[in-house]
Structure formats: C-alpha cells, structure tokens
Curated annotation (Swiss-Prot):
Gene Ontology biological-process entries: 'de novo' protein folding; G2/M transition of mitotic cell cycle; protein folding; response to glucose
Functional note: Acts as a protein folding chaperone for elongation factor 1-alpha.
GO CC annotations on file: cytoplasm; nucleus
Name of the protein in question: Zinc finger chaperone ZPR1
Lineage: Eukaryota, Fungi, Dikarya, Ascomycota, Saccharomycotina
Entry superkingdom: Eukaryota
Region (Disordered): 1-31
Assembly and binders: Interacts with elongation factor 1-alpha.
Amino acid sequence: MSEQKEDLFKPVGEAAAEVEDESIAEQNKANDGVKLTGAQDAMGHPVQEIESLCMNCGKNGTTRLLLTSIPYFREIIIMSFDCPHCGFKNCEIQPASQIQEKGSRYVLKVECREDFNRQVIKSETATCKFVELDIEIPAKRGQLTTVEGLLSEMIDDLSQDQEMRKSIDEALYKKIDDFIQKVKSYINCEPNTIPITFILDDPAGNSWIEYKPGEPQHKWSHTQYVRTDEQNVQVGIITRDQLEQRRQEQLKQLANRERNPSESVKVGSANPQFLSDATDIENFNNEVQTFRASCPSCTQECETHMKPVNIPHFKEVIIMSTVCDHCGYKSNEVKTGGAIPDKGRRITLYCDDAADLSRDILKSETCSMVIPELHLDIQEGTLGGRFTTLEGLLRQVYEELESRIFTQTSDSMDEATKARWVEFFAKLKEAIAGKVKFTVIMEDPLAGSYIQNVYAPDPDPNMTIEDYERTKEQNEDLGLSDIKVE
C-alpha cells in the first residue's frame, strides 16, 4: 500500500492568488452590479465592469470603466462597451473632474507632419475647427485621440455611403470625394497645404491639446474665458428654465428701478455698502466697494469687491476680488481703465540682479510676456490680470505648470520631451532664486501693463519702453476695427 504525500503548505504564489480572487469576489458582491476584472493600469487603477443596455439591439452588453489620469492634464474615465449579441462596440471618454471655473480655447498651428500626431482630449462639450479647411466638428462624445485622428474619423464617416451616392447623385459623390482627397493632402503635408490652424473650444474647460516646451508663441496658445449664460446651459450648470427665470427676475428688478430710482439700492440685498450707495461714493478711492454679480462657476449671486489703486508713475487701476459662498469660487484680478491709447506698448527689462525680482509688475489680460533665456512664453489671456512682483509672477507660473504638466508618478512622456521639461523647470527655479540673468519682454496692445522703475523719475538703464502701431489683426481681436463713433 503506497502512501500518498499530503501537501501541508501551498506555494506563496498560489496562496496570494487565492486571497486576491477572494478579495475581488467579496468586493464584487458589495459593489451592487459593478465588478472588478482584476486588470489595472500602470498606476494601479482598477478596471471595472458593469452590465448595461445595448442601444443597438436592446439586449444587455458589458461596459468596462477605467478611472485614470493624463499626466499633464487631469483625471478622465475611459469607457468601452461590447455587446456579444449584435457585435456593437463603442469607446469614449468622460471627464472625471468637475466643470472648470472658466472655459478653455486652444489654438494650434500645424506646421509639420509631427504636429498631426499631437494628443487631443476632446470632451463632450467641445467643438473643433480646422480654419483653412472650413471644417467644424460639433460637440459630441468625448474622445482621446490626435489631430490626425479627428480628420481621419471625419473621412471615414464621409466615405461610408459614397458607393450609394455614386449611383444616386454622382455630382454630390464627386464633391465629397474631392473634399476627402483635399483633407488627405493636408494630412500628408503635400505642397501648399500647411500650415493649418486647429482650434479646440470647450466651455467646460475639460479639453486639451498636447503642448511641447520651447515652442514659439504663434504655434500653441491657450486662453480662458468666462462662460455666457447660454454656455452654462450647454454644459449643464443651469437648466433652460432656470435661465429664463433669472432673466425674468432681472427684468423685474430693472422695471422696479425705473419706477422708483430711490429704492434701487434695496433691490436684491440689504447690504448698504454697494457701489450705488451715495454715502460711499464720496470715499470711492479710499474704501473697498462691494456690488453683486453672478458667479462665473455656478451662476449664483455673489459679492464682488473692488478698490481703485493708484500706481506711481503709471495710472490708476482697479483690483477686483470675487468670492462665492455657494460653490467656493475665488478670483483676484486687476483691471486697467481709461481711454484706449492710439498705440501699443512694449516693455523690455534686463534682470541682472536678484533685487530686480522684487519689482512691482502689472500684467493686464491683453498682455503677453516672453523670457527668451528661459524659453517661457505667456500668451494673452493667460493668468488673467495680475498685480504682483516679478518673483511672484514667475513663482505662480512655476507652480501651475509643475502641478499640471509634469508629475513623477504618472508620466507617459517620451524621454526627449521629459528632458526638455526637466531643463525648463531647472532654469525657471534658478531664475526665481536670482541665480541667472534674463530678459523680460512684455507686449500689450492696449498699453495697460507696467514694470516698476526703481530709478523713477530718472530713466532706468536696464529698461526700455517703446510704443508701436497695432497690427490689423490686433485691432480686429480687440474689437477696434470699423468702430462707428457718430
């Protein structure tokens, strides 16, 4: 009789696998229909599975969800649906983060074949435009793709029914085929096709075009803007009924003010320190004035504080601060007033001493700033209006870029791009510490920006100020073209 050897101890790998399987099974029971597949991405985020309705055949299919992070963007949800009954498949992305405080507008100049390979995050509220091709892609499902991918998908959609069109309407078939060939010629960068302008506009602020450090100013730009009421409805912050209700309330308040102007300060609030309060107007320059406005994030009514500040050897500006008690939104901006000057202004400062970092600096919304030695290019509309020091402005740029663009834990950049970012941040840190010399060039078409002259009223040997004629494009962007004053 042979004895059968009994395994008293299981291998560590088998025991760990059983524990993991049991853990996944217990979590699947507790998740009420959401199952863990056991798969993970590179950062350890689990892939989840849920049974969902197929909109093609009406039976149940499987949706897989992965919450992950784009290294220099933000969190997203990648969704993949598969129906075993009819074979229907679909992939899309959804932003996992909240709707941003402001909308975003990206502009990319596609000048070579590599630019077509840039990653693009297109949320469900974003629209895309290819200006030279006269193409606009409306808001639809979210996508993680490339510039070429957007055009290729459009070509695939147009090509689907071409054979049918050829037999029904040959003229229409020929027009669509010519257009498809034209788009393909742009993708292949054939002669006389590039550059091409690609615009990505997202009122929710959750879209993005890949940026590469060290690019010239005209190549890539990102501006933020305050959403309109219609855009707030589009992104789902408020409903159409709520918008109409608020408009009716505003019309009622306006009618009450017209009927009884002396009671206008009482409409909407009991706060006596509004800008319209006659007792406070006398001390307008000495006290902080408060008025009610709509929050750009949640559209609820909130208070905005403002105070005029006179900058020596420049002009008076208005510092504005908004705080919303409903959603917690906060913003601080500087507005320059007065008449629009005939010319723009370019200020160039050579910083050769650490003391230059303590100079006051006013950067208006229309001002662009370039530091060639650091390969830093700040576009118009970026950072908004700021009244701070040169060190404070550079530190803000460093903190925002580091938190958004470069992370050590979730980095999918290629080695060349990563090396450029590391070099860029190293130079920027040295500049903030006053260890390197650099040149600041501020260009404002409205001449509303300023750098402190520490030698005032005498000229500053390290600073030059020159006025220049605005271009036709700048006048057009600022709304100064074809103005009728009569």
